[in-house]
Structure formats: C-alpha cells, structure tokens
C-alpha cells in the first residue's frame, strides 16, 4: 500500500544540492517539429498533408533515415521498439527522439551545462531531421499548431495508450483531441536544490507562465484562417482537461507548498495503469481513490505515482525537475531564446529575486485573465495595470543585463526582432498570411519557404558569439 509520505519523498529524492551553484545548474530542452509531405493526390505538387504513421514515407521511414544519417556524421542512435515497430530513438548520453500522438517529432535532449551545447544539439536535430525527410520531399514546420488540417487529416499514433486518451478527451474538454494531434511546443526543464527551492521557483514560474506564452506565441492560424489567438496552441490547452491542465489557483499562491501540488495530483485520475501486460483504464478513479482501494485489481505502487505525474499537463509541471511547458514551438533560430531567457531569469539569484518581486506583487486573482489574454492577444494584451509588452521588455532587459555576449546572443537577436517592438513570432506569421491575400495555400507556400530559409541559416551560421 502506497502512503502519502512516500508521495512527498518522491520530490525529496530528486533534489539536487549541486543546483545552488552555476556549475551544477542544468538545462533540459525539449523541442517539437511538425512535418508535412506532398499530397500524392495533387498532381500540381502545391499542396501538402501531415506526415503519416506508416511506411517509408511516414514516421517509421523518417526514424530509420534519421538513425542512418546520424551514423554517417558520427552520431549513434539506437532504435526503441514496441514489438516490431520502430517508435523512437535514443543515444547513450540520454537524449531521445520521440513521436507524439499526431506524428510530431520531438527532441528530448540530455541535461546540458551551457547554452552553446543546447544550440549544438538543436542544430544536429534540425539538420538530421531535414536529411531524413528529404527523400520524401518533406518539409519541417515550426508552428505551435497545425495551421490547415482538420483532425481527420492527421493520423493518430498506433500506441494503445494514445487511443485510450483520444477517446477520453471529448468527455473532459472541447479541444483535447486537437491537443494530441495538432500541437507542437517548446519545453525547458530546470533543477531544484531542495523542497524550499522547488516551492519558491515553482510559484514564481507559474506566475511567469502567461508572459512566456505571450512572448513566444507562434500559432495564430487554424483551419486556414486567423484563429483570433496569437497562441492557438495555448488556447487548445486551456480547453483540454481542467483536472490535469492549466494553472490552479493554489500554484500561484504566496503560500504554495509541495503539499498543494500533491493534493492536486491526487484529485486527478490516471488514464490507465499496466498490470502484468494488461492495461486497466482508470478514468473513473482519482489517484486518491486508488490509494484508498477503489479498484479491486489495482494496488498502487511508487512507480505508479511517478507515471501519474508524467500524465498531468499543467503549464508548469513538477517531476524530478521543474518542466516549463508554456511556449509554442519556434523556428530553430528563435527557439534558443527560450533557454537563454529562462536560464538568466531563474538560475541567476540576483535576477530571480527581482523577478520574484515583480511577479509576487501582481494580484493572484488576475492570473486566470492573464493566461486567457496571453493566448489571445500575445504582447498586445492588457489586464488592468499590466501591459504585456512593457512587462515582457522588462523581463528581457533584466535577463540580458546579466548575460555575457556568448550567453545573450540568441536572446538579444530575438529581443531585437520581436519583443522590443511589442510583437511575437505569431505577428510575423499573420503578416505573411495577409501578404498572401488570405489564401491559405498561397500563405502556406510562403510560410514553408520562410521557414526553410531560417532553418538553413541556423544550420549554416551559428550565433557569432557562441562558444
């Protein structure tokens, strides 16, 4: 029988005392890409379809070629299989390539010491992925949500757990199936040195979350037209499942403690648990119910708690790390601004103290509005006295002041390109859409060409200050 004290011990187990010092502070980036391939039914070659789940021109073929190209450039990627199906790749250093439910391909990088290492691994991922889709004339697309295709046009992974989730989604939210099939995000994981450090960082980062959504919003197009949201991806997440997503009020409270996170997690239900090869669907049982013996065949164990935590999707998630999940995916040359900004804001104690003062001064009652406004308006958002553009510029300037040229290169480029002017990547996407006379396929071709240029620039021209 699992006891409550063991739930708290999980977080204690993963405290990293070395994280109090800069040399021990790691960065754990995750980066998702959408992929499209030419529509074989269109002889004009002007339209595309999402990457499928089968065959040489689908996910298995892309993974196989990724592995083969990696070997050509001295990278060893081992296949991960379910039965005979190749479902992912991993290397000995701890990085992995995984497939999300709608065929999104994700780099889950190993913990990194320096931003230059994050840039190098991201460059390798983008280069290898481009080579892997070249034989099928595929194109990478770094937008936070599929901009043209409806749900039926996007294949669902054959993994059974995804099918269980997919069938459950309409019961708990209006857009959960879109979340699974059509979204792509950027995530960053940070360490905590103690439970006190975890609690302090968590409450501050939860308050920071809406501003991260606004700064890095990059998904304004849905079903071929402007959605009314700068981050339609974040809007999707807000309408997925209130029991396991979002930012509960207790998370932003001045008095937040790890017990609040445990209580919240206990109220959520596991999608399923595996026992001796049999999958038990458990959506009608909260984790607390299961601990109290509500299911005759399930006696929950410590590993079930760990698995349950990974199937919760708040904007900021606590596991063995603090996982920041509020950002849309971005083009490769823009995405390095995410770890650069967060490393400076969270790991630099002087900057973090200033950030804490700024954020904890804001009224708790306004934060649900912040999240809604961030998704809709990006940096044009305002809630009472808080102007998102002004707040974002202050955040960026605080971070850049603390960084040397090497650390700040990618962030300063992003700042000068977007935030300084009160815009996000979504605004540039919308500009291109209107330039294309609001014709979705004309815009899509322009968007793909713009992304291709940025991808090639990123691969061939490292940030001039990178070490």
Residue ranges and their predicted role:
Residues 112, 134-141, 145-317:
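Loop-rich catalytic cores of soluble enzymes, especially ATP-dependent carboxylate-amine ligases
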Residues 117, 193, 197, 326-335, ...:
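Conserved phosphate-binding loops in nucleotide/dinucleotide-binding enzymes
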Residues 1-174, 182, 334, 338-347, ...:
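Terminal catalytic/cofactor-binding subdomain
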Residues 283-366:
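Long, well-ordered mid-to-C-terminal structural blocks that present hydrophobic/aromatic surfaces
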Residues 39, 193-195, 211, 330, ...:
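A very general structural signal that marks isolated residues within well-ordered alpha-helical segments
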Residues 34, 187-189, 323-325:
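Structured core elements
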